[in-house]
Swiss-Prot record:
Peptidase M12B domain ranges (all copies): 197-391
Tissues in which the protein is found: Expressed by the venom gland.
Keyword Zinc: yes
Record-given protein name: Snake venom metalloproteinase kistomin
Main location: secreted
EC number of this enzyme: 3.4.24.-
Species this chain originates from: Calloselasma rhodostoma (Malayan pit viper)
Disulphide bridges, residue numbers: C308-C386, C348-C370, C350-C353
Subunit structure: Monomer.
Record's cofactor remark: Binds 1 zinc ion per subunit.
Tree of life domain: Eukaryota
SUPFAM superfamilies: Metalloproteases ('zincins'), catalytic domain (SSF55486)
Length: 417
């Protein structure tokens, strides 16, 4: 027997729809206010979770009913997910919060085969969804005692800076030049049957990020969760899962000088990751998030093909926009470089895919055929074992890959493109 619980709230458009409002994504010029109606199906006798595994919400967009189906992203967090910050005296504080009953979902719109959704339900509905080929954002309005939410399109957000935002990677080499000696991919029979790649990601936010949020590290942690949830929407069709291994906030001071040169900052972060982070936190990729304004139009940089090399599985990202979707695409782009993908070129026939060299104002959240080919070539040539095995804490800089044969020595210049 199924008991259907309906939370009945009227569906309405805000009477002053179209006026300007300041939301988390910035100043929004055109929006409508809706009151979502939650529809939850519970099995009789089922244990009530704070956040159900599946949920449905109804509301209207432009007068048309929308039924939003949501499923909890159960692979968003690693089992040993951790959060780290520092006390005023510099003591490192690491906690391991329970993350099974979390509030991050992916989904679709009923009767819209091309629809997608990436939503958090932590405090109302917050995120984005694709409906009839157009992308909409939704977030709760901060009105006491109200269930009102704003729904708006990306083009209705006032742009703070029209300057094109670029990835700093310059293409001048082919990925097969990186490793001269191929090695064997040693997988168990079970891993061979289900060869789903898993990126165990640690996000490190520097002091400038903490200052930007006035010391509220929960805001940074939520930003990280939201970005990774959205990145999974991009990566799952590629057979790749992005799993949050941890997030670290430098609440007291930076552990190296964060410079306006993205290249120098990437070098420094990669060095710190080897000497510090990798010795205490299992992961196979790390991304550095900073509010530092990088030189020129650069907002990100990463080592191409560095994912399973202990020295170079890293990238740096500037917090360049208030729009969570664009930040997720930016970090997802740099992780793509770590996975061997280069920039989309004219022949890729996709101007707004994830690996486009510029941050597009209307990204598709898809990878081009070129990106798929680069990734498949990376898997074939590099045999990246770390993507198919849970990472272990290591004190070593490089790992033997076939018997006692070590990786051939690779310099920074080999990876920096």
């Amino acid at each position: 027997m199924i008991e259907v619980l309906l939370v009945t709230i009227c569906l309405a458009a805000f009477p002053y729809q179209g006026s300007s409002i300041i939301l988390e994504s910035g100043n929004v010029n055109d929006y409508e206010v809706v009151y979502p109606r939650k529809i939850t199906a519970l099995s009789e006798g089922a244990a009530q979770q704070k956040y159900e595994d599946t949920m449905q919400y109804e509301f209207k967009v432009n007068g048309e009913p929308v039924v939003l189906h949501l499923e909890k992203n159960k692979e968003l967090f690693a089992k040993d997910y951790s959060e780290t910050h520092y006390s005023p005296d510099g003591t490192r504080i690491t906690t391991y919060p329970s993350v099974e009953d979390h509030c991050y979902y992916q989904g679709r719109i009923h009767n819209d085969a091309d629809s997608t959704a990436s939503i958090s339900t932590c405090n109302g509905l917050k995120g984005h969804f694709k409906f009839h080929g157009e992308r909409y954002f939704i977030e709760p309005l901060k009105l006491p005692g109200s269930e009102a939410h704003a729904v708006y399109k990306y083009e209705n957000i006032e742009k703070e800076d029209e300057t094109p935002k670029m990835c700093g990677v310059i293409q001048k080499w082919k990925s097969d030049e990186l490793i001269k000696k191929p090695f064997r991919l040693n997988l168990t029979p079970q891993q061979q049957e289900s060869p789903q790649a898993k990126v165990y990601l640690v996000i490190v936010a520097d002091k400038s990020m903490v200052d930007k949020h006035n010391g509220n590290i929960k805001k940074i942690e939520e930003q990280g969760h939201q970005m990774v949830n959205t990145m999974n929407e991009c990566y799952r069709p590629m057979g790749i899962i992005i799993i949050m291994a941890g997030i670290e906030c430098w609440t007291t001071n930076d552990f190296f000088e964060v410079k306006s040169s993205a290249k120098e900052t990437l070098y420094s972060f990669a060095k710190w990751r080897v000497e510090d982070l990798s010795k205490r936190k299992p992961h196979n990729d790390a991304q550095f998030l900073t509010n530092k304004d990088f030189d020129g139009n650069t907002v990100g940089l990463a080592f191409v093909g560095g994912i399973c090399n202990e020295k170079y599985c890293a990238g740096v990202v500037q917090d360049h926009t208030k729009v969570p979707l664009l930040m997720a695409i930016t970090m997802g782009h740099e992780i793509g470089h770590n996975l061997g993908m280069e920039h989309d070129e004219a022949n890729c026939k996709c101007k707004a895919c994830v690996m486009a060299p510029e941050v597009n104002n209307n990204p598709t959240k898809k990878f081009s055929d070129c990106s798929r080919n680069y990734y498949q070539k990376f898997l074939k040539d590099r045999k990246p074992e770390c993507l198919f095995k849970k990472p272990l804490r290591t004190d070593t800089v490089s790992t033997p890959v076939s018997g006692n044969e070590p990786l051939e020595v690779i310099t920074m210049d080999d990876f920096y493109a």
